């Protein structure tokens, strides 16, 4: 396995010059950055992608997990600039570039059934057809999107209804629709980069945040919160992209190589993440037995579901006809893949 290179943030610009030297289409070493640790879901996908590329070609993939090359905004910029060939980034961050990608933050749009989700992401016309040109406009070739697991709220006080979030400063990604979601839920949404979240919870700058279960364990967020709440409101989604100039410059054979690797990594990762939620929650409870875990009943979820209509309207207001068309197609795709 190629070793990742760690840069100080002050050296990123200088490092970029060295990295950029290898970005031509003929490069044997391709660079791939993602937002999580090597052992997290994005890391599992990246390692399988690397394995497939290297097993079926002479190319090499160099992996850069979270923090190696900066925050999420940094790795996206480096991919658009051609310094990186591949990037895995959640629509939560790309929403500022591609407003329609915020559709994944419309509450209760995505089902909690993991098998249904896996079929949807693989077969969806909205994802596989309609999103591609939107990403291309930003210099990105969308390879695929995949689910990382049901999102859980972690807080310092119990949450069983929307009123429990009143005056709670709740960390959200820098995503306009996610801000609107937590406003509608009754919280005070507080955008923060991930690197500041643990400390923010520790010092009470914020009192809550959301993420899939595996991430709560791997980042030890359970150490600085006391309650985990599953409201069924969302499933964390991420997207794998290539620099479009790089991808377009590949031979047809190498483009197929990349597509095949992305598909193999998708299938592998979906199975992994379906198991990760249960195993990682068990690890959290072993590490902190006093952690309180609540799965909201349908009655308890009712206020959150009522707020979802307001957020959906905000999404259409933000994105216009393009967003409305994608939302309509996603609903059709979800219905088509339900069984």
Swiss-Prot record:
GO terms for biological process: transmembrane transport. L-ectoine binds at residues 36, 171, 211, 215, 236. It is found in: Periplasm. Residues 1-20 form the signal peptide. It comes from the Bacteria. It holds the Pfam family DctP. One of its GO terms (cellular component) is periplasmic space. Disulfide bonds join 162-303. Keywords: Disulfide bond, Periplasm, Signal, Transport. Transport is enhanced in cells that are grown in the presence of ectoine, but not by high-salinity media. Part of the tripartite ATP-independent periplasmic (TRAP) transport system UehABC, which imports both ectoine and 5-hydroxyectoine as nutrients, and not as osmoprotectants. UehA binds both ectoine and 5-hydroxyectoine with high specificity and affinity. Monomer. The complex comprises the extracytoplasmic solute receptor protein UehA, and the two transmembrane proteins UehB and UehC. Belongs to the bacterial solute-binding protein 7 family. This is Ectoine/5-hydroxyectoine-binding periplasmic protein UehA. It comes from Ruegeria pomeroyi (strain ATCC 700808 / DSM 15171 / DSS-3) (Silicibacter pomeroyi).
